[in-house]
Amino acid sequence: MKPFLKKVADVYALNEADRLYKYCFVLPNRRSRVFFESYLSDALNDKHSIFPELTTISDFIDEYSDLVEAGRVEQLFLLYQAYRTLAECDQKQYDDFDHFLHLGDMLLNDFNDIDRYMVDAKELFFNMRNLENIKTDYLSDEQIAVIKEYWGVDKKEVKEDSLFVQSSYVNLWDNMYELYNSFLQALEEKGLTYGGQSYRRVAEKINKMGADDFNFERIIFVGFSTLSNAERMIFERFKKLGIADFYWDFESAFLDKDNKGSYFLNQYIPEFKSIYDIMDSKPTVPNINILSVPSGSGQGLVVRSVLEQLVAENKLDVSDAVNTAIVLPEEKYVNSVLDSVPEMFKSINITMGMSVGQSPIASFLTNLANLEHRKKELKGELSYFYEDVEMLASHPYAVMVGGTGINDLVGEIHRKNAYFVPKSMIAEGGRDLSDLFGINEEEPMVYVERILTRINSALEKDKNNLIERYFVVQYMQALNQIKTVMNRFNVHVEKQSLFFLLSRTMSGAIVPFEGKPLHGLQIMGVLETRSLDFKNIIVLSMNEKVFPTKHYTKSFIPNSIRSAYG
């Protein structure tokens, strides 16, 4: 079967070779762009033609945007600044940044969705303000946690006191439209924006432009699936101007109105039609084998077995394995898969990189954050929950920062059967663990900087720790970015908030692997497979809530309201 992207490349090379330089092809991501470029280059091999513009949807949006996307931390500080200014104007008390942080993070999610889906913000906030019979049933654990954090009440009280929830909820949305506008104004004054707002502004901008305002005679959108309302508006405008063409990756056999998986394509295909017919007259049905594996980590061994079997059956050429993909819905198994690939495969291309969130330093900082979160003042003395101390001690980085004294402390906890570990116990027997626990009441930024510096210095002594050091250096750079933004906004944060900001800054960050996309065995995440076709596909973790992933929306907008606004 001919790959989808190759079909599009071939039909344009055949019919439009002399006009391609006037066209722009827009694809979902960089991965699909690379493959399409290769297919088009092959198709034009014997033709005299100037190559067209090839871009991704995100780069396309950036091209028409007059603002730069701000980092998440800067967005949070700007939102807090707008909130504080509004509170001062209304002569109301306002919370410090630590109190506001989790609420602000959730509001940024809501603002982003509101704009990406072209929702009338004023109307939405009015409806949220007047939502009748608000009950606690729809509240997720995340929402309850934020209410507890922001209004200073217990989760149990939130669940039991629906009147409190209603009044707090209404209070939240009272000035939300004003806050939303103030936030947008603050961003624009600095030449900044955020993802959803960028999509909205570009969609509105393109909607006012004519065909002659673009540098291309035709813009071809290839391989999209689910569209946001902003993307759909862009598609509709280009269609109306008569300068668009659309190609959807689907098999007619799967376009069943009762199949939820084809719900969106059933809408898009009749509305955004293709100039050329690239459908196969006889759709092929894949040969699917399902293998049961008793453990997640054991999947790597099964991958090895499957690869060896494909080679033995002449279904896979080790010298040209680009048509075989290993797809990982769970990034954490990338190392076990790499270790399991047979040595006969000399070339491997890993497109997903290694997640910073799966690194040792990430787990160590999580342990420190948990330690900080559950500490208490007992009998006038700062005390830590014993499980958090034990978890911290079990991490190899704990010794790098605090020495072997941390292991002595765990032994003392067991001997005394302590439930909470007071500050005095930590210092018993001459144990100097103040740097690890940060109990000298120093600035949180100084504390975390020292932690990262000590770990980095310890890792420097062994050349085999290059990847771990890279992760630590990434966190050090992120911390410096946060420090710069904090100084600019003159905001102080506590340790717990600093750990949260670090986590948000590094969210989604990866260590990229160097490779040749068009050579070797392909190892990738699910989203990177969009618009791509392979002869052999090995998908791990085909379990419920993993594939597809169960998404929990961190939002204050109930699902019923979300559905009403599309």
Predicted regions and their residues:
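Basic/charged alpha-beta structural segments of nucleotide/phosphate-handling enzymes
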Residues: 30-213, 229, 408
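Short, compositionally biased "basic patch" segments
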Residues: 159-185, 258-285
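Residue-level signal for short amphipathic helical patches enriched in basic/charged
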Residues: 190, 241, 529
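Short, Lys/Arg-enriched, disordered terminal segments
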Residues: 1-5, 209-212, 240
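Residue-level detector of anion-binding/catalytic polar loops
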Residues: 189-192, 244, 347
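Anion-coordinating catalytic cores for phosphoryl-, nucleotidyl-, and glycosidic chemistry
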Residues: 1-61, 65-71, 219, 235-236, ...
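Extended, H/D-rich, highly charged conserved domains that either
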Residues: 171, 212, 218-270
